[in-house]
Amino acid sequence: MDAPIKAPTALNTEKARALAVALAQIEKQFGKGTIMKLGAGEVIEDIQVVSTGSLGLDIALGVGGLPRGRVVEIYGPESSGKTTLTLQVIAEMQKIGGTCAFVDAEHALDIQYAQKLGVNLQELLISQPDTGEQALEIVDSLTRSGAVDLIVIDSVAALTPKAELEGEMGDSLPGLQARLMSQALRKLTATIKKANCMVIFINQIRMKIGVMFGSPETTTGGNALKFYASVRLDIRRIGSIKKGDEVIGNETRVKVVKNKVASPFKMAEFDILYGEGISRLGEVLDLGVANHVVEKAGAWYAYRGEKIGQGRDNSREFLKENPALAIEIENKVREALGIPLVQAAQGSAEPEKAAKPEKVEKADKPVKAVVDKTLAAPLAPVAS
């Protein structure tokens, strides 16, 4: 049986007065808004997010993308797609008018590849610092300006402390990088939140020696980043995509290892095509089949009873030639999953009027549809 609710007593009144005095003193010393009741004042806004460029990963993150004003860590083995994923995030941020910076500590950014992924090089800020301290000071200055929306650091392993650079080869300097990262993150976290700036750290994997139980894998830079990161993504290459004997891309799996804004431990799989980046249309097909928006019978894919292609590659090419139809299918998938819809590009037809495959009586040839020139506009960015 629940205990009866007690009426306010003199003791409770005294506690309320003492609390009011303490709050007034704190606001006088540190400024208005330093402390307040969570239900008072302004309405708490929903988490602002930026798409990753992958529909499946946006869904796995639970909020439709990566959160702004937070620290994010993306780690994985070599050539697993870490830099590609961050460049896609930069492209998505630029589509909604955000200012982005890339701190290239590895001195290995391929600007031609970045451009192919949709990055606007004219608007991208880039820095190639000499030391780890210099790199993190640059990040601190950019976040304090309040004018930058996204900063990518590639990578934590390349943030070499100045003392290590000035020392001799073979010098033992334990813990220098870990202390550097710990100090920097203590300093940066509050500023990142106030500036609503997302900071993405790319990290590498190392093997711990003598581990008998559990995974021997660990990330560089100590434990501070593990604690301060709101989202941690583990990205792995799980296979190759071939066209004949030629390898044209990687099958990639991303696991949400840590997530402070939604449920963790979800996974997403997508294709990364060389020279193109994440195959969004391939994801639309796969998620369409999984959510019963697209029908699949044998090798044939169909939408609303109309065949759109034989085989995944042919169907993906058909959607590439018919962007309005691709938007329509993607919105059906988004509607089924309960996430915000994507808007059609200006100058394109409405999704309901999108070009549809012609009906065929015989299924011996791929369907060819006549597409109006006005439907050739690219897919619109995902609304964050």
Swiss-Prot record:
Localization annotation: Cytoplasm
Record's compositionally biased regions (Basic and acidic residues): 350-365
Swiss-Prot/TrEMBL keywords: ATP-binding, Cytoplasm, DNA damage, DNA recombination, DNA repair, DNA-binding, Nucleotide-binding, SOS response
Short name of any one Pfam family annotated for the protein: RecA_C
Function text: Can catalyze the hydrolysis of ATP in the presence of single-stranded DNA, the ATP-dependent uptake of single-stranded DNA by duplex DNA, and the ATP-dependent hybridization of homologous single-stranded DNAs. It interacts with LexA causing its activation and leading to its autocatalytic cleavage.
Positions of region (Disordered): 346-365
NCBIfam families cross-referenced by the UniProt entry: tigrfam_recA
SMART domains: AAA
Major localization listed first in the record, in broad terms: cytoplasm
Gene3D superfamilies: P-loop containing nucleotide triphosphate hydrolases (3.40.50.300)
Gene label: recA
Protein name, as recorded: Protein RecA
SUPFAM superfamilies the record matches: P-loop containing nucleoside triphosphate hydrolases, RecA protein, C-terminal domain
